[in-house]
Amino acid sequence: MVDFTAEEKAAITRLWGKMNVEEAGGKALGRLLIVYPWTQRFFDNFGNLSSASAIMGNPKVKAHGKKVLNSFGDAVKNPDNLKGTFAKLSELHCDKLLVDSENFRLLGNVLVIVLANHFGKEFTPQVQAAWQKMATGVASAVARKYH
């Protein structure tokens, strides 16, 4: 279980309220597929993933990235119950989709990079620490069924 301080929750919620989920989600998933190309194997039905520009411009990547980041919204709303919040997604990714659980950690790290790039000076080390903690907590919760 991840324990968030009131300050961490406030920092996460403050940034979340300013976030364009569609844009940030697409960028995060796109970066994951570019930086860690072996993750592309889970997205065979997404069409052209042959280059960085093809990936970043792919509407299916953008749509799925939005869907993924909307799930992070559930975490922002329920930071004290990440395991419960992600129980069904954990089961889906483990039992049906057979996604390597390490990919959730990688995606969380990429999301933190996307947020830092977008929010600049507003993404202070304290805000980064809060978001990194959230990303790690979400990755652990989604990977829970694997253990």
From Swiss-Prot:
Q: Which CDD domains match?
A: Hb-beta-like
UniProt-annotated binding residues for heme b = H64, H93
Subunit info?
A: Heterotetramer of two alpha chains and two gamma chains in fetal hemoglobin (Hb F).
Q: Does the keyword Amino-acid biosynthesis apply?
A: no
Q: Which GO terms describe its cellular component?
A: blood microparticle; haptoglobin-hemoglobin complex; hemoglobin complex
Pfam families membership: Globin
Q: Which residues form the Globin domain?
A: 3-147
Q: Enumerate the UniProt keywords alphabetically.
A: Heme, Iron, Metal-binding, Oxygen transport, Transport
Domain of life of the organism in this record? Eukaryota
Q: What is this protein called?
A: Hemoglobin subunit gamma
Record family assignment: Belongs to the globin family.
What is the reported tissue distribution?
Answer: Red blood cells.
Gene of this entry: HBG
Give the residue spans that cross the bilayer. none
Please explain the role this protein plays, according to its UniProt record.
Gamma chains make up the fetal hemoglobin F, in combination with alpha chains.
Matching Gene3D superfamilies, A to Z?
Globins
- Heme among keywords: yes
Q: Give GO BP annotations, semicolon-separated.
A: hydrogen peroxide catabolic process
Q: Which GO terms describe its molecular function?
A: haptoglobin binding; heme binding; metal ion binding; organic acid binding; oxygen binding; oxygen carrier activity; peroxidase activity
